[in-house]
């Protein structure tokens, strides 16, 4: 109709006039006139070793194989590289989002006047550690306290302990484990040069705990009051511990819990990967720094 010539003007009817007279949107007309059977548009650039439909099973297999919950797309991308499957982070993020494989996220709060813009991590192992406690419930013995200590550089769990009583003396057990393992002996001034970050819990501020730190040569480094960010390394480990062990398993006795914690400590130290260390495990970070220190000596 738009190509038909008007008998009065001797000019063809244009598409705009025809659509206006018929009260028809031009977009609808153009959509109806589109070529049929055309292939859907493809993403530009090279496909890589795997197409999208082939890469998704690898993503699911990687998430199923890891012993941890809540790992994000960056760690999935790193584990794919270890398996010689090369792709981009943005592609992994897109596919995990499309297939609802991303870890759940919490919306952050707007920072107030107390903004923590410093850093509590270190560049060398055995410079600063963090300690904290959490609790869980056992079926036969009730509530149990869990104490642990973490290195602020490698994020390695250097000691962990479960007990029925959450006293100041029990809080020292992970520290004793770490000193024996990392410094070779439990003796006066054995951990000279190490600082320990802790909160203001009654166990950590007690006279006995502080005296034990002084005996070992460890400097006490308490976080600010009502500021858990100051002990953020230990708080992050609490979250990992809960999401991967305490919230997914039940325990009958405290001893069963203690054995499970020791097993988790080994799994975490040798399999949890850390982005800021190039997706290496805590044990790998410590080993590399120890070897570099031995060569320098």
Residue spans for each PLM region:
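Residue-level signal for the short linker/turn that defines the boundary of a DNA-recognition helix
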Residues: 12-14, 71, 87, 252
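Mobile genetic element proteins and their domesticated derivatives, centered on retroelements
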Residues: 18-22, 29, 59, 76, ...
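K/E-rich alpha-helical interaction surfaces of small helical-bundle regulatory domains
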Residues: 17-37, 260-278
């Amino acid at each position: 109709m738009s190509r038909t010539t008007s008998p009065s003007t001797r000019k063809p009817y244009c598409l705009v006039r025809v659509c206006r007279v018929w009260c028809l949107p031009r977009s609808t007309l153009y959509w109806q006139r589109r070529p049929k059977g055309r292939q859907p548009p493809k993403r530009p650039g090279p496909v890589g070793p795997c197409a999208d439909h082939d890469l998704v099973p690898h993503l699911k297999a990687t998430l199923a194989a890891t012993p941890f919950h809540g790992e994000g797309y960056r760690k999935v991308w790193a584990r794919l590289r270890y398996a010689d499957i090369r792709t981009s982070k943005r592609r992994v993020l897109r596919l995990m989002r499309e297939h609802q494989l991303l870890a759940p996220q919490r919306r952050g709060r707007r920072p107030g006047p107390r903004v923590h813009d410093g850093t509590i991590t270190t560049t060398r192992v055995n410079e600063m550690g963090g300690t904290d406690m959490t609790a869980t419930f056992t079926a036969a013995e009730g509530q149990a306290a869990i104490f642990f200590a973490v290195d602020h550089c490698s994020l390695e769990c250097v000691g962990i302990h479960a007990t029925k009583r959450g006293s100041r003396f029990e809080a020292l057990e992970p520290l004793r484990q770490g000193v024996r393992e990392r410094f070779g002996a439990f003796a006066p001034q054995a951990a000279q040069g190490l600082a320990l970050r802790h909160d203001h819990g009654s166990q950590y501020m007690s006279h006995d705990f502080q005296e034990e730190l002084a005996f070992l040569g460890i400097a006490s480094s308490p976080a600010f009051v009502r500021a858990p960010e100051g002990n953020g390394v230990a708080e992050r480990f609490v979250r990992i511990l809960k999401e991967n062990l305490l919230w997914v398993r039940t325990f009958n006795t405290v001893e069963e819990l203690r054995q499970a914690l020791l097993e988790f400590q080994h799994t975490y130290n040798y399999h949890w990967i850390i982005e800021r260390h190039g997706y290496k495990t805590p044990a790998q970070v410590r080993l590399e720094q120890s070897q570099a220190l031995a060569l320098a000596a």
